[in-house]
């Protein structure tokens, strides 16, 4: 498995991320079958505006760019939300990406492992995430890494 290092995202990287993330999230929502692409685009824009009112500087949100520790090449990114709950400091991964051409080469696992290390260093007691039902590769990775299902949404088409 490759090793990665996480570096706080720069403003330039954040702006590049945001230039594609709204549409990517909308596509994920629409492909899950929960709403039309038009409605998903509206939901995506509203969600990003609500979650990131101050962009990269939004309180309790952290963005990291992942680099291959050996080559220095950029391999992906992760966006994590921090929240204090009754059990202590928790984290939720809002977005996790591996560059498309590098998928299935161990970088997903490496980014998740590096993220867990950073979160432990910061005193985080648990981390959660969402995965769309049709993303079988990600679901498999998360299960292999010890994530447990905490809720499931299901639907059945009637027409």
Each PLM stretch: what is its role?
Residues 112, 120-130, 153:
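Conserved GNAT acetyl-CoA-binding A-motif
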Residues 95-98, 104-121, 140-144:
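Conserved acetyl-CoA-binding loop-helix of GNAT-fold acetyltransferases
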